[in-house]
Amino acid sequence: MDEDEKDRAKRASRNKSEKKRRDQFNVLIKELSSMLPGNTRKMDKTTVLEKVIGFLQKHNEVSAQTEICDIQQDWKPSFLSNEEFTQLMLEALDGFVIVVTTDGSIIYVSDSITPLLGHLPADVMDQNLLNFLPEQEHSEVYKILSSHMLVTDSPSPEFLKSDNDLEFYCHLLRGSLNPKEFPTYEYIKFVGNFRSYNNVPSPSCNGFDNTLSRPCHVPLGKDVCFIATVRLATPQFLKEMCVADEPLEEFTSRHSLEWKFLFLDHRAPPIIGYLPFEVLGTSGYNYYHIDDLELLARCHQHLMQFGKGKSCCYRFLTKGQQWIWLQTHYYITYHQWNSKPEFIVCTHSVVSYADVRVERRQELALEDPPTEAMHPSAVKEKDSSLEPPQPFNALDMGASGLPSSPSPSASSRSSHKSSHTAMSEPTSTPTKLMAENSTTALPRPATLPQELPVQGLSQAATMPTALHSSASCDLTKQLLLQSLPQTGLQSPPAPVTQFSAQFSMFQTIKDQLEQRTRILQANIRWQQEELHKIQEQLCLVQDSNVQMFLQQPAVSLSFSSTQRPAAQQQLQQRPAAPSQPQLVVNTPLQGQITSTQVTNQHLLRESNVISAQGPKPMRSSQLLPASGRSLSSLPSQFSSTASVLPPGLSLTTIAPTPQDDSQCQPSPDFGHDRQLRLLLSQPIQPMMPGSCDARQPSEVSRTGRQVKYAQSQVMFPSPDSHPTNSSASTPVLLMGQAVLHPSFPASRPSPLQPAQAQQQPPPYLQAPTSLHSEQPDSLLLSTFSQQPGTLGYAATQSTPPQPPRPSRRVSRLSES
């Protein structure tokens, strides 16, 4: 009994321990099964153990390979992995890793090419390197890549194992969001060496498969690649952040209506680098890219109108001075009591450069017609054969070859649109190569005058500028034919993509030339209209006849067309006034004096000519009241048309001797009416300031005989003129209407005889004044403040030196 009980107890304890062990084993197998990927069905214990064993084996192999390939130098931090360290090194060097075969095919490129050159790795891989180089550098870069292949069919192992670093400079095409923009090239430096690999992928159709001949190809399985680090010649201080394909990253912020930060959540610092207290109170526009400000302003205006919306993709400046692409969904929150806008809630999402480029190109495709020529970088997405872009032949590229000296380009992502420059010469400063605007290489047909009147420009802008298309097309063809021999556009026929790019460039040239031609034609039309207006004014002035009548006490301007021979001889023989200015009147017809050209009527009605008078009083020297009758022979153009008085007009004062009033009465010689005309023979000049003090000797004989006037004279009274007494009479030249003296009958015009017209000397502009001594004061004109748009005249007189004289009253032309 006792033994059976003992055996039963041992068996129970054994079963209990076995059950415990089995339960523990099942738990462990279950845990392993849950850790294995792809466990969609329930696996038995054997399958679970097999998969675990396989995973451990692969893990050991990968660890062994990683230890072999990992950097073991002391300068690599131990807390960084190989991938992290490589990424940091490439960012610090402003470069990327590229693997190129000997024929130029790109088989690998790192992701850091996107923030540096704007290309996606998928677009660059499987393409030829020559597609991204200017045509001038194709031959040299190809020789560098295939130089070691020309010695033997295959490189020696010693050549591949040696540290034969190869360095060269070239220009590389920069990617763009808009494929229609002119290509821009960045000056870069290649540093690398050749290595042999067994599993190099064969390139697909890239347009350069048949570049190398058969003997130069390396045997299959021993391909040689050029592994290089590509660096920018000039480092970029601001560049885009390389965003990997990670789960959606977003953060929330709150802004005021003035777009200032009010709140920033905890998810923002890992993305943008700023802590909340660093951005609170600052404007969001301080962190936006300058090229995106216009688009963001439109989105914010849409938000203020509709209360919610979605922004475009824009660049945000991080704390590490890098641009990260964001897209924002926002809405306006209102106060719960007064329903007034309180603040704006924004949810910012990180977007990749690939998504941004797709969105931008879709927008451009919607805005632009589909027939527009596309940039070669856009054609690459369609897996088409890409040749070197040919439009560079038609442009002024500056240098024909590769610069021998390193010339880094000073460029940044924030200024790529405005820093397009031509490729530098070998001795020039480092610049960025781009295909310049097409009009810079073509000869300009004409240049607009730099100093055009503002009024003329406004008239030219409002005039119709319709232009015949045939003339512009002929001009464009002629300019292109002239530029083709110089730029070397004599290459074989290009593919369709190149032809479309050339056609787009030529169309741009044509449009610019047509616009320039329209501006020139508008300017020519404006000048023709101005010339026509001047001709009309000259015809109007020539047709107008102004008659002037002499009034006894008043000073008048008389242009004696015919003077007595005795007076003429006396005036010509007197040497006292050798430099007396004369009014030269051109007579187009014999016996007829040219028509008077009056100065601006508005100015003449406001000005009075005051003559100097001596202290000796004259009897009956008061101004007669202006007669209300106007001459019937006075043309209507006198009151409506404002003409210009030539600057060469000189005023000569003829002062009669103090005689009785009866002697001042007109003689029978005044019975003949004469036509009074002036011709605009010289350009207009303003009055000189010193003309008011000029004096000249009188042309009156010492015997007291007054020079007879053979021509009727006219008075133009001003409405503000008043008669004065005989002791202080102030004769005033009154313009505006003709006054007929009551003692003079209306005279009829009589033509001159041909003989008299031939012998007639140039008439003088004369005005009689009162005389105090033998040599009276001449008619003195003072300057006036010329109003804008009015034309003035100057009475230029020569003043010979004279001894001091008694004080006289100076005649002046003053404003009324």
UniProtKB/Swiss-Prot annotation:
Where is it chiefly localized? nucleus
Residues annotated as domain bHLH: 9-59
The ranges of region (Sufficient for heterodimer formation with BMAL1, E-box binding and for the effect of NADPH) come to: 1-61
Q: Give the observed phenotype of the deletion mutant.
A: Mice exhibit altered sleep and locomotor activity. Show alterations in sleep homeostasis, altering the electrophysiological properties of neurons after sleep deprivation. Display normal patterns of sleep throughout the light period, however during the active, nocturnal period, they remain awake nearly continuously for the first 8 to 9 hours of darkness and tend to fast rather than readapt to eating in daylight. Exhibit a dysregulation in the lipid and fatty acid metabolism pathways and a significant reduction in daytime contrast sensitivity.
- PAC domain: which residues? 311-354
- Name the PROSITE patterns for this protein: BHLH (PS50888), PAS (PS50112)
Write out the biased-composition intervals (Basic and acidic residues): 1-10
Q: What does this protein do?
A: Transcriptional activator which forms a core component of the circadian clock. The circadian clock, an internal time-keeping system, regulates various physiological processes through the generation of approximately 24 hour circadian rhythms in gene expression, which are translated into rhythms in metabolism and behavior. It is derived from the Latin roots 'circa' (about) and 'diem' (day) and acts as an important regulator of a wide array of physiological functions including metabolism, sleep, body temperature, blood pressure, endocrine, immune, cardiovascular, and renal function.
Q: What is this protein called?
A: Neuronal PAS domain-containing protein 2
What organism, scientifically named, is this protein from? Answer: Mus musculus (Mouse)
